[in-house]
Amino acid sequence: SGIEAAKKWTASNGLPSERVVILAPRFMEKVDAPGAGTLWWNNTELEARGIWRGGADSDPRADPGKHRVVSSFTALDVLIESLLAGKKAGRLPMLSRIALAGHSSGGQIIQRHALFTRIDEAAARLDSTLNVSIRHLPANPSSYCSLDGKRVDAKSGAVATPSASFVARCAGYNSWHFGTDAERWPLPPRCASFPGGTKAAVALFATRTMKYMQGGNDTCACNQERGQYENVRDDPCTCESHGLETTCSDEIGGSYRLMRGRNYWKTLGEVYGGAQPPSHSLSVVPNVGHDHTLLWQSTEGIAAIFGA
């Protein structure tokens, strides 16, 4: 879908398709049967430290000799740094923008990576005058990392701390990767070692170019893939949700993805003093459900990737 979106954009602007370079990293899990020497992540919901979409380190068993690990966030930073280095070396002289786009689980890692990326350090090391803009595009994620413990109240619509009764039955609802607390799960090492801590990360997050994308029809509130996941309800479902996560930490954000995206957007305004950061925007694409192809090839999707 990214390739087709790039083709549409270059064609409409009279440019060769070679003007766009697409990198598509795959974060593998043990079930994917990765080959020797391939990083993989222990993607177990009950052990959040292994989840690649939350910046976890790769499983040390992927490196039997030395047990070295790599954070999924580090992997993305290295990709970005390699592109910047390519421009500095003259291999990518026309590079002007890097867009990190992800849908569903991919959208989750993109939002969280934007919070704890170290790419500013890399850009400063290479050359601060490279003049390459970087943007993050989280699309239709099932959950977000909230920046404080408040959520949108389902009844009043106000942004507030959840009730004591909810907190009692959903211990650690704001722990990583749903929030930045460490009550239930600690922050991954890559995040915990962020210079200046979480407060500094939240402050920098306001300066990121964030383009949140939501399908206007991504409103299925259950999971039709019954019994396949440990983090979803085993309810009958007649609509298309493609793995909607339904833990209490997920559902305090809303019943379905579109609601969760809008609620998260509302909480951003509260975190940053009454208004969302100017470099952040939310687009709802009409007549699109949980479908990456339709979303990225939409007018709104192409504009988010290639527009101003």
Residue ranges of model-derived segments:
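Histidine-bearing beta->alpha loop at or near hydrolase active sites
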Residues: F27-K30, L282-H292
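Conserved hydrolase catalytic core segment
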Residues: R112-I134
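Gly/Ala-rich beta-loop-alpha elbow adjacent to hydrolase catalytic centers
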Residues: L100-G106, I110
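Conserved acidic catalytic loop of the alpha/beta-hydrolase fold
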Residues: T74-S96
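Catalytic active-site module of serine/aspartate enzymes centered on a nucleophile-bearing elbow/loop
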Residues: Q297-A308
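Active-site machinery of serine-nucleophile hydrolases
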Residues: G2-S82, L126-S128, I134, P138-L147, ...
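Residue in the alpha/beta-hydrolase core beta-strand immediately N-terminal to the catalytic nucleophile
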Residues: R97-A99, R135
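The feature captures the conserved acid-bearing segment of alpha/beta-hydrolase catalytic domains
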Residues: D127-E270, G274
